[in-house]
């Protein structure tokens, strides 16, 4: 049975992990739960934290197996997929997925709010703004929820392929 592990800060990653686990008939556990030493596939989900994705570090610590990493963030999904930042972080054999998340300024920690204010100020000052820049500016200081469980279809398919179910 596939293993699902996640790290969540504001909740959207946990929502995705639990829904994926439900679809696959397993349980989603946080990073504190060890992954059994078996040959079952592993899907690891975490938010994007600036240039780092905690799921990558966690997945690298696990015994060799089929692994997929899902980065949950607020970059427009089409931009995240075209940039494919995970490609330079993980082996080519790993599955790489990008899921739209949620950002809730109403519950955000003050340090994160300050970081976002700085980033948005820099982006606002750019003379030529991309669609992603405009998106970031428009959601500044607003609770935004882009969670879309249909985005899990590709990960579910990846798992089922590895279990010879498709």
PLM segments and residue spans:
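N-terminal beta1-alpha1-beta2 submodule of the flavodoxin-like/Rossmannoid cofactor-binding fold
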Residues: 1-62, 160-166
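Generic secondary-structure boundary/loop-capping signal
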Residues: 7, 45, 100, 137, ...
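Charged/polar, solvent-exposed surface patches and flexible loops
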Residues: 22, 58-61, 84-88, 117, ...
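Helix-loop-strand module that forms the ligand-binding subsite of alpha/beta enzymes
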Residues: 32-111
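Glycine-rich phosphate/pyrophosphate-binding loop and the adjoining helix
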Residues: 115-166
């Amino acid at each position: 049975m596939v293993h699902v592990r996640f790290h969540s800060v504001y909740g959207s990653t946990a929502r995705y992990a639990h829904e994926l686990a439900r679809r696959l008939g397993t349980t989603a556990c946080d990073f504190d739960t060890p992954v059994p030493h078996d040959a079952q596939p592993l899907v690891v989900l975490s938010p994007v934290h600036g240039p780092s994705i905690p799921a990558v570090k966690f997945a690298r610590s696990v015994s060799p197996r089929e692994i997929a990493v899902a980065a949950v963030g607020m970059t427009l999904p089409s931009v995240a997929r075209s940039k494919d930042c995970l490609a330079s972080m993980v082996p080519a054999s790993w599955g790489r997925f990008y899921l739209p998340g949620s950002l809730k300024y109403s519950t955000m920690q003050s340090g994160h709010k300050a970081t976002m204010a700085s980033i948005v100020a820099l982006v606002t000052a750019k003379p030529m703004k991309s669609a992603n820049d405009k998106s970031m500016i428009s959601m500044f200081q607003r609770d935004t929820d882009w969670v879309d469980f249909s985005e899990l279809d590709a990960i579910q398919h990846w798992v089922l392929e590895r279990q010879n179910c498709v």
